[in-house]
Curated annotation (Swiss-Prot):
One of its GO terms (molecular function) is DNA binding. The gene is ihfB. This is Integration host factor subunit beta. Keywords: DNA recombination, DNA-binding, Transcription, Transcription regulation, Translation regulation. Gene3D superfamilies: IHF-like DNA-binding proteins. PANTHER family: DNA-BINDING PROTEIN HU, INTEGRATION HOST FACTOR SUBUNIT BETA. This protein is one of the two subunits of integration host factor, a specific DNA-binding protein that functions in genetic recombination as well as in transcriptional and translational control. One of its GO terms (cellular component) is cytosol. Belongs to the bacterial histone-like protein family. It comes from Methylocella silvestris (strain DSM 15510 / CIP 108128 / LMG 27833 / NCIMB 13906 / BL2). Pfam families: Bac_DNA_binding.
């Protein structure tokens, strides 16, 4: 599912909301999560999961096509850990 499909599904389930308002809400939520992560904060949505950032050290990698060694710079990457309720729902089937 892509963002536009998510917006459409939320709008379909909430006919009292305009599609453009749902899109603004979804964008605002994603912007706030992104801003928090860029500050190094952790974002926890109980039952869903937690977004955080992890530091990856510089390392020597390998080009899969040529086999040549390449230097990979250190970087910060986003990380998501699922919550207990989400793991249980995924393992017990999905409700629509």
């Amino acid at each position: 599912m892509i963002k536009s499909e998510l917006v459409q599904r939320i709008a379909d389930r909430n006919p009292h909301l305009y599609l453009r308002d749902v899109e603004k809400i979804v964008n605002a939520i994603l912007d706030e999560i992104t801003n928090a992560l860029s500050r190094g904060d952790r974002v926890e949505l109980r039952g869903f999961g937690a977004f955080s950032v992890k530091h990856r050290d510089a390392r020597v990698g390998r080009n899969p096509r040529t086999g040549a060694h390449v230097s990979v710079d250190e970087k910060v990457v986003p990380f998501f850990k699922t919550g207990k309720e989400m793991r249980e729902r995924l393992n017990n089937g999905v409700d629509d």
